[in-house]
């Protein structure tokens, strides 16, 4: 409120604890969803109620922007830090994860762990438009800088992300030029709550490759027809799989990425202590 009265541009980040565990909700929302019949996929009344409470909280923020008279001059970026846990409690066996039809969830480089909601509203952005242009949370900072008129600053040229302003201003249509083509995800440790296997992935175009570092197993998926990552194409298209593997390895070497080896524990050792790099 003070910033809106100052007439100066400002940045505000509101990080909700929802929808994180422990799953807790208001009595009002919980009673609403406990009365509903359970669906085939979504059955957790507490999770549904917590999600509605989050929605209510976002509504308070939007109403305040209207009240302060700055709603028409404000960009809002709504997103998550990662996919949901596959199930609760984390070690419980499940048929469909909370991210279904995406596979698995938080801690993994599968789509359930890395594909998240990303919604932007503001001046010059067409309401109800939709984009299938892949973006990353690394793009948020350079995009904000561009929207604020600072896209040419030297610092913006030294970070991983790129501005997506042109896509936002063009009803979600367009491509984004990146220094390193594709998206790279790296899990160089064993997490027994998740896969329990160190792995990395690369997404470029329609294809995604996952490499498991404990035995060099390769999984290749065509995300345009297999968003759930159920049909491994590595045996059918071995040259494609090897090409993506080589591209990913070059990227890790270029950036001196942490390399998995026995004994790496991400919770108790710093990167310097690991002392294993590409």
Please provide the spans of the model-predicted regions:
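Metal-dependent active-site segment of extracytoplasmic phospho-/sulfohydrolases and closely related
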Residues: 13-16, 52-90
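Long, internal low-complexity/basic segments
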Residues: 140, 216-217, 223-278
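Short, solvent-exposed turn/loop segments enriched in Gly/Ser/Thr/Pro and often Arg
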Residues: 13-24, 78-86, 160-162, 186-191, ...
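Loop/turn elements at helix/coil->beta-strand transitions in domains of secreted/extracellular proteins
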Residues: 5-12, 70-76, 204-207
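Soluble non-cytosolic domains of exported or imported proteins
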Residues: 41, 45-52, 131-138, 158, ...
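C-terminal cap/loop subdomain of S1 sulfatases and analogous C-terminal strand-loop tails that border
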Residues: 84-109, 125-127, 133, 138-219, ...
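Active-site His/acidic residue clusters
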Residues: 1-46, 85-87, 91-92
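Non-transmembrane alpha-helical segments in soluble domains
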Residues: 1, 58-62, 66, 141-145, ...
